[in-house]
């Protein structure tokens, strides 16, 4: 499902207009981004957790040249599913997703 499809589905489910849902989703993206940029987490209990995480320096290599290199420490974003998302995936078959 892409963003447009999500907006249509939420609009149908809530009986809101697609314009209202689009504004709400844009606001959610903006506020989530600003919150993570401040170093805080966004927690939708039981559904989703988004937070900044520290990544330590590590050794890596260039796959084309096999040359070793040092990867600098950085800050990334962790997105973890809550129980409701995990349970939603329980009924799926592994074979449908394995390639």
From Swiss-Prot:
DNA-binding region as annotated in the record: 61, 93-94
SMART domains assigned: BHL
InterPro entries: Hist_DNA-bd (IPR000119), Histone-like_DNA-bd_CS (IPR020816), IHF-like_DNA-bd_dom_sf (IPR010992)
GO MF: DNA binding; structural constituent of chromatin
Family membership: Belongs to the bacterial histone-like protein family.
Domain of life: Viruses
Gene3D superfamilies associated with the record: IHF-like DNA-binding proteins
Region (May be involved in preference for HM-URA DNA): 52-77, 90-99
Protein name: Transcription factor 1
Keyword Protease belongs to the record: no
GN (gene name): TF1
Transcription regulation is among the record's keywords: yes
Assembly and binders: Homodimer.
């Amino acid at each position: 499902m892409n963003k447009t499809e999500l907006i249509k589905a939420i609009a149908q489910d809530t009986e809101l207009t697609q314009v209202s849902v689009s504004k709400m989703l844009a606001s959610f993206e903006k506020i989530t981004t600003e919150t993570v940029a401040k170093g805080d987490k966004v927690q939708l209990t039981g559904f989703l957790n988004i937070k900044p995480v520290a990544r330590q320096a590590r050794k890596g290599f260039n796959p084309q040249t096999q040359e070793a290199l040092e990867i600098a420490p950085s800050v990334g974003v962790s997105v973890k599913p809550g129980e409701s998302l995990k349970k939603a995936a329980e009924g799926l078959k592994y074979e449908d997703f394995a390639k």
